């Protein structure tokens, strides 16, 4: 019994040490808020994570997130009574929806100073309320805290909802969504 326990402990310790992160591995957890600009009005609250590797001062990785969006319905009609099966959207003041962005991520990070500039580019696909392609570009400042870092980034984000993917009851969400906002990221 002691021998089996010893072998099990050695196997567990070996497995844990073999999964240790390499020096070039980086992970980011980002929280952000954006406001829609252009033909759509509303806001979006987001939380995402990206993981990948550093190649010199450039991070290359991928990520996933979750966003809660509120879009004002410009076609809202007070006390609207639905006539057809799918025209009830006219009686809704605000659409609330969840998006799940899946993206590739490239960041430029200059690590030789306590405070340094950064850039961030994301491209991918949105699943949820705004189903379609997405792109995001941002620039900001990184604060080195030793083994970890914080960064603040101002961004512009675009998501495209194709008309053919939209059902009749959510006609307002078709077309381009563009938002401006601020993200704060924790780097590990």
Task: Please give the residue ranges for each predicted region.
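Bacterial Sec-dependent N-terminal signal peptides
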Residues: 1-25, 184, 188
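Residues that line or immediately flank small-molecule/substrate-binding pockets and catalytic motifs
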Residues: 8, 32-33, 66
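Short glycine/proline- and aromatic-enriched beta-strand/turn motifs that initiate or cap beta-hairpins
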Residues: 19-55, 59, 164, 187
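Residues that define the transmembrane beta-barrel architecture of outer-membrane proteins
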Residues: 23-27, 41-45, 96-102, 115, ...
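Extracytoplasmic loops and strand-loop junctions of Gram-negative outer membrane beta-barrel proteins
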Residues: 30-34, 86-90, 121-123, 164-167
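Feature marks short, surface-exposed loop/turn motifs that line or immediately flank catalytic pockets
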Residues: 35-37, 68-70, 125-127, 158-164
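Gram-negative (and chloroplast) outer-membrane scaffold detector with strong preference
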Residues: 49-152
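A generic hydrophobic-segment detector
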Residues: 132-188
């Amino acid at each position: 019994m002691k021998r089996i326990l010893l072998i099990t402990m050695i196997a567990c310790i070996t497995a844990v040490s073999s999964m240790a992160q390499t020096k070039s591995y980086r992970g980011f957890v980002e929280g952000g808020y954006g406001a829609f600009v252009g033909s759509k009005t509303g806001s979006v609250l987001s939380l995402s994570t990206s993981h990948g590797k550093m190649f010199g001062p450039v991070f290359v990785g991928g990520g996933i997130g979750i966003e809660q969006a509120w879009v004002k319905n410009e076609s809202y009609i007070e006390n609207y009574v639905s006539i057809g099966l799918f025209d009830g959207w006219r009686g809704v003041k605000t659409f609330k929806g969840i998006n799940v962005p899946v993206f590739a991520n490239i960041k430029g990070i200059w690590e030789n100073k306590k405070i340094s500039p950064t850039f961030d580019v994301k491209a991918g696909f949105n699943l949820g309320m705004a189903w379609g392609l997405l792109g995001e570009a941002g620039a900001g400042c990184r604060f080195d805290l030793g083994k970890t870092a914080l960064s603040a980034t101002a961004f512009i984000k675009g998501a495209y909802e194709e008309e053919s993917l939209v059902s009749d009851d959510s006609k307002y969400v078709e077309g381009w969504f563009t938002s401006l906002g601020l993200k704060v990221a924790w780097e590990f």
